[in-house]
């Protein structure tokens, strides 16, 4: 059996990574001495995410100086491969600089204006609509509206005004009116619905208008057999005024005295 001469392993593989030690500034550096285990702390940044975010933010804004934590020495873990491409850290830095640029976010740009969040989350409001100001008690009074108008004249804003600002007649609406505004205005004719008509027919109109006139086209063509009413005053026999009048009681004719006498037998 042929034996191969022993050859020493390459120094590249024989080199072991230096031990890592955690410094108080939450960065990893190589430690020459033995590492003493430390208790785990949930408030300690073991991964150094704060450093990455600070570097990315400082790299994206050249006018600002480096952060307070960027002044300390930072050393990453030793590289095991000496032939690594030197352009990878730059590419990673550019990626982090674009991905972690928090100042590019619209919400982090500065303090939000008073009406900005209201307009953004207006679609998520379950009471969005005409009656929202009445139910939630946020309808402005006359003095508030006048003050807002004067402020708008001094410092005009480009944002559109709320929907309830253009309708001052809702300010004095009662609770019943607010409840009615929340209900969907569906047109249902009870006469056609009770007669088993199609849904497409009885949802296009109502039975009677606010003034009491009959609006149903089917009922308007009907003529009451008792009173002959039709058109605006059309109704069925059940709702006819004559059907509610009790009929006169019929009394039997009075009996005569001759009929009251007992009959005699004829011989």
Curated annotation (Swiss-Prot):
Give the residue ranges of motif C2HC 2.
224-240
Give start-end positions of Acidic residues composition bias.
78-90
Name the domain of life this protein comes from: Eukaryota
Q: Name one GO molecular function term.
A: zinc ion binding
Q: Which cysteines are joined by disulfide bonds?
A: none
* Assembly notes: Interacts with PUM2, SNAPIN and CTNNB1. Interacts (via N-terminal region) with CTNND1. Interacts with DDX20 (via N-terminal region).
Q: Mind telling me what this protein is named?
A: Nanos homolog 1
Q: Which organism is it from?
A: Mus musculus (Mouse)
Source taxonomy lineage?
Eukaryota, Metazoa, Chordata, Craniata, Vertebrata
Gene field:
Nanos1
């Amino acid at each position: 059996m042929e034996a191969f001469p022993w050859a020493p392993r390459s120094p590249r593989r024989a080199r072991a990574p230096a031990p890592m030690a955690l410094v108080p500034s939450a960065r990893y550096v190589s430690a020459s001495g033995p590492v003493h285990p430390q208790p785990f702390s949930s408030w300690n940044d073991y991964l150094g995410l704060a450093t990455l975010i600070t570097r990315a933010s400082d790299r994206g804004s050249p006018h600002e100086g480096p952060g307070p934590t960027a002044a300390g020495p930072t050393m990453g873990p030793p590289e095991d491969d000496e032939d690594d491409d030197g352009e990878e850290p730059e590419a990673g830095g550019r990626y982090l600089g674009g991905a972690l640029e928090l100042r590019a976010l619209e919400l982090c740009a500065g303090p939000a204006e008073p009406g900005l969040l209201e307009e953004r989350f207006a679609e998520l409001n379950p009471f969005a609509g005409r009656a929202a100001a009445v139910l939630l008690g946020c309808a402005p009074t006359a003095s508030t509206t006048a003050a807002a108008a004067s402020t708008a004249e001094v410092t005009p804003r480009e944002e559109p005004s709320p929907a309830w600002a253009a309708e001052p007649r809702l300010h004095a609406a009662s609770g019943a009116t607010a409840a009615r505004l929340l209900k969907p205005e569906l047109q249902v004719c009870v006469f056609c619905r009770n007669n088993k008509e199609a849904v497409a027919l009885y949802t296009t109109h109502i039975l009677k208008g606010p003034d009491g006139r009959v609006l149903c086209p089917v009922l308007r063509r009907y003529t009451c057999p008792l009173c002959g009413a039709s058109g605006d005053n059309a109704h069925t026999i059940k709702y006819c005024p004559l059907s509610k009048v009790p009929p006169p009681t019929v009394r039997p004719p009075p009996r005569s005295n001759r009929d009251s006498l007992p009959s005699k037998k004829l011989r």
